[in-house]
């Protein structure tokens, strides 16, 4: 059975759950220009390679690609510009502490619209080793086999 798509997610970072063990999530607002928010509403955003950095006590989103707005004019935005994330000071300090630990990083998990504002769900993740990824795949296959057996058993 296919997974249900998250109805309000405009962009998801599916590779994040495979490459990182996500331990904590925080919602952050995004500072966008007019043409950027129009492109985001059309789901023309890619956060697969994006990451969060902290510059001068501010959280910024790097390597997030938002396609130029098709009906935009010559004042259209730069697709890969650095975007500021809106967080409380306490949350920023919490994320700085988490990213300072060895092997941890802050990555965007999904982008969505909430009450008319663009939001980004950030995850604190620890990078997985190759054997961790293989182990997760084995667990996933075993769970699928058990679910299939239970489903077949209920038919009769």
UniProtKB/Swiss-Prot annotation:
Q: Does the keyword Cytoplasm apply?
A: yes
Q: What GO annotations for molecular function exist for this entry?
A: RNA binding
Q: Which GO terms describe its biological process?
A: trans-translation
Basic and acidic residues: bias regions:
132-156
Tell me, in one coarse class, where this protein mainly resides: cytoplasm
Q: Where in the cell is it found?
A: Cytoplasm
Source species, domain of life: Bacteria
Name the segments for region: Disordered.
127-156
Alphabetical GO CC annotations of the entry are:
cytosol
Tell me, in a sentence or two, what this protein's role is.
Required for rescue of stalled ribosomes mediated by trans-translation. Binds to transfer-messenger RNA (tmRNA), required for stable association of tmRNA with ribosomes. tmRNA and SmpB together mimic tRNA shape, replacing the anticodon stem-loop with SmpB. tmRNA is encoded by the ssrA gene; the 2 termini fold to resemble tRNA(Ala) and it encodes a 'tag peptide', a short internal open reading frame. During trans-translation Ala-aminoacylated tmRNA acts like a tRNA, entering the A-site of stalled ribosomes, displacing the stalled mRNA.
Similarity field? Belongs to the SmpB family.
Q: Protein name, please? A: SsrA-binding protein
